[in-house]
């Protein structure tokens, strides 16, 4: 009798384990669909939140921190300051920053990163970041990415504060860590794939972007292999030599905002596509007194 009870109990456990595995797989599939729907709704919510914030400004203390740290601040035209500050406020209110190590000046970091990420979309909807769940801030080394200064997936950004702090004041070097990683985020947003095409495959601009990426990939390869200086930083060439193209949009974005005049001169098609996408014209930005 005891053996029969034991066998029945064992059979029940096996059945429950099987049932759990089967249903957990189903849940994961359903969860991904639900997550996408939630993110789309989040996009609507973010745009509404930005609309409610319209007219709000950063405090003098916050503005001073941005002026003292972000090199691009002195170049941004006055007519973009209001929408830039509104997006910065909305960003800080709606996105989660995670201090991955103790001792970081996290409030200052939040303001600086939010400000640069918001400059990227100063003329675009904040729903571009609808899939973003968290921004992880590390002192120096990013866990599992020892050689990287920053990483991006569709849902998460990782940034090294030591590197960011050292380089953020350089407004014309063509490489901006925050803009670079958040450009990846925008690239991921429409289809979950980073292929340097920031629009949906259903967009009327998709084929034009596709051709541009292929053509620019070839140009960047030739420049890199020939050791030539180029408006789009060599990192894009280094990645491209392996056949990868995700870095073209992110490196191109950094060049667009920080080397606008040169990019327009050397790669007019790239510049015009970026100008149309971002809605700004950095080639005509002039430093303010």
Model regions and ranges:
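Short pre-active-site segment immediately N-terminal to the catalytic Zn-binding motif
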Residues: 161-179
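Feature marks short, highly hydrophobic, charge-poor N-terminal signal-anchor/signal peptide-like helices
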Residues: 1-12
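N-terminal topogenic membrane-targeting module
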Residues: 25-93, 98-99
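Metalloprotease/metallohydrolase-associated module, dominated by Zn2+-dependent proteases
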Residues: 2, 114-123, 140-153, 163, ...
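Auxiliary, metal-adjacent structural segments of Zn-dependent hydrolase domains
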Residues: 85-158, 166-168
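Active-site recognition of the HExxH zinc-binding catalytic motif
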Residues: 77, 173-191, 250
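Alpha-helical transmembrane segments
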Residues: 14-26
């Amino acid at each position: 009798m005891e053996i029969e009870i034991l066998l029945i109990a064992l059979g029940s456990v096996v059945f429950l384990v099987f049932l759990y595995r089967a249903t957990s797989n189903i849940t994961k599939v359903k969860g991904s669909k639900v997550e996408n729907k939630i993110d789309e709704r989040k996009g609507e919510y973010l745009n509404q939140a930005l609309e409610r914030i319209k007219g709000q400004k950063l405090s003098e203390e916050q503005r001073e921190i941005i002026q003292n740290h972000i090199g691009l601040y002195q170049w941004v035209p006055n007519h973009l300051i209001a929408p830039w500050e509104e997006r910065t406020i909305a960003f800080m209110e709606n996105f989660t920053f995670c201090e991955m190590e103790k001792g970081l000046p996290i409030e200052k970091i939040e303001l600086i990163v939010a400000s640069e990420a918001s400059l990227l979309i100063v003329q675009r909807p904040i729903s571009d970041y609808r899939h973003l769940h968290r921004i992880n801030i590390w002192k120096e080394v990013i866990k599992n990415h020892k050689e990287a200064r920053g990483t991006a997936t569709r849902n998460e950004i990782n940034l090294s504060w030591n590197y960011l702090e050292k380089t953020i004041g350089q407004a014309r070097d063509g490489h901006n860590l925050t803009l670079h990683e958040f450009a990846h985020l925008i690239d991921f947003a429409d289809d979950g794939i980073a292929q340097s095409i920031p629009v949906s495959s259903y967009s009327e601009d998709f084929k034009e972007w596709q051709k541009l990426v292929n053509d620019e990939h070839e140009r960047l390869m030739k420049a890199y292999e020939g050791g030539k200086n180029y408006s789009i930083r060599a990192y894009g060439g280094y990645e491209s030599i392996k056949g990868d193209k995700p870095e073209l949009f992110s490196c191109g974005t950094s060049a667009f905002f920080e080397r606008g005049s040169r990019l327009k001169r050397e790669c007019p098609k790239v510049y015009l596509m970026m100008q149309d996408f971002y809605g700004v014209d950095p080639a005509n930005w002039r430093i303010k007194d």
